[in-house]
Amino acid sequence: MCDSSQSTADVLIIGGGPAGSNAAWELGQAHHRVILFNASIDRLRDPDVNTASTRPALDLLLHSRRKTPDVFRPFRQEIGKESSEVSVHNQRITQVQRLPNGFFQAEDDVGHVWTAKVLVLADGAEEILPDIDGYDTCWEQQRILTHPAEDEPRSLISSCLAVLAVGDLAELTMALHTVWQARQFAASVRVYTHGDEDLARALETRISPDARIAIQTTPIQSLQPGSDSPSQVVVHLADGSSIVESHVYHRPASQLQGPFARQLNLELTESGAIRISARVPYMTSLDGVYAGGDCASLGQRTLFKALAMGQGLAAAVAARLERGNWGNAVEEQD
């Protein structure tokens, strides 16, 4: 364990998910002193959910945007055992700042302080769930697909896929793309516009009459987990009727999970992700601060991409540190 009051590391990494953990491992292998902070909790609140059976490995790797079990806990434990250069802390970092000497300081929720030459943000993102009663329960029970291919292979070929055209998916272009994609996977599609009559009319004029795509305009009163299958959802409508759906698709918007971009006054993209440089890989708008994983890619969140970004982060940070150690220092900025 590093002495938080005296020892200055090469890199502080906030976030122990795929991007942060992979970056920590790669940097440790390159003999850079790394402190990895992870404060994730078990993201599935329902203890009865059998995550091993409900989330296939390929689903987690290729499509998952939802909060998932902490599958990287064993990896972080192994990093701490196998790499003498990496220390893993489960403290929750609450404050970061750049010091006058150009180093970075992080403080946890009990007042411990760490410093390093470089700061890496890989603290992830969180979903903004729509304000529909019961949605959060169905989401946590993983009954809402975030990609049509998430479910068992070929399970939608003879089924109806319900699409919730709410939130970001209530925008016409996004709604159309989503509905057409859903129809590619399912025998039929039912679109819930949640009372948005204008969206319903716009969709009707752009969807083929024989496409087997129905539009339901009645506002949704609540969602309820069904009892016949792990994916079933009962949609209760404001007119008192209910529709049992075997599969429901929706992709909620995402936002940054931590306060660090705001504390460091980092530039953000239009989607709200941390903007990273096109010239200096993974560098943010503040020299010495790098970002990767979901916090730098809100729109495309998969484990494969996060792992790749973690490796890229490590390469970029290592190059900076090694140039500082053995070459002429050149400030990296756009």
From Swiss-Prot:
Keywords carried by this UniProt record: FAD, Flavoprotein, Oxidoreductase
Signal peptide: none
Protein's name in the database: Thioredoxin reductase aclT
Function of the protein: Thioredoxin reductase; part of the gene cluster that mediates the biosynthesis of aspirochlorine (or antibiotic A30641), an unusual halogenated spiro compound with distinctive antifungal properties due to selective inhibition of protein biosynthesis, and which is also active against bacteria, viruses, and murine tumor cells. The non-ribosomal peptide synthetase (NRPS) aclP is responsible the formation of the diketopiperazine (DKP) core from the condensation of 2 phenylalanine residues.
Family: Belongs to the class-II pyridine nucleotide-disulfide oxidoreductase family.
Source organism, top-level taxon: Eukaryota
Pfam families given in the database record: Pyr_redox_2
Pathway where it operates: Mycotoxin biosynthesis
Organism name: Aspergillus oryzae (strain ATCC 42149 / RIB 40) (Yellow koji mold)
Cofactor binding notes: Binds 1 FAD per subunit.
EC number(s) given by UniProt: 1.8.1.-
SUPFAM superfamilies linked to this entry: FAD/NAD(P)-binding domain
Enzymatic class: oxidoreductase
Gene Ontology terms: biological process: cellular response to toxic substance
Cofactor: FAD
Subunit structure: Homodimer.
GO MF terms, alphabetically ordered: oxidoreductase activity
Binding site for FAD: 16-19, 38-43, 93, 122, 294, 302-303
